[in-house]
C-alpha cells in the first residue's frame, strides 16, 4: 500500500466525521482510559451491539508519518497522544436503508473517532438522522443514532459529554 493510498483512505474516513461536526451535532462520550483500553472497550461494545467493524485506522500515526512531506501547519497542536477511526456497520440497518432510500445507505457504514490524551479518551460519533432524504429513511437513521448511542453508553468508565470539551493546547 502506497503512502498516497493510505492518506486517501485516512481522508475518506475523516471527511464524513468533519461534515457531521460542522453540519450536525456530535455525540461525545468521555472515557477514563488511555487509547489501548478505550479502543478495546469501544470495539467490544460495538460487537456486542450487533455491529461489524469494517476498518480501523490510526489516523494520527498515518498522517504524522507524512508530516515531513505534507508540512501541515500547526499539526496536532492539542497534543493528542493518539487518534483512531473506526468504520462499522449493522448489516440489518444497512439493508433497511438500501430498501427505503438507497442513497441514504451511503451513511452506513458508520464512523466514529477516538481521541486520546494521556489517560483520557473521547469517542466522537456524528449523528446521521438529519441527512435522511425521506421520512422513512429519517426514521431509520434516528433509530440507528439511538442504537449507536445506547451501545456507546455501555462503555465502562464512560460518561456523556455535554458540549465540546476544552482540550487545551498544552
What are these regions (language model features)?
Residues 125-170:
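C-terminal partner/receptor-binding element of secreted or periplasmic proteins
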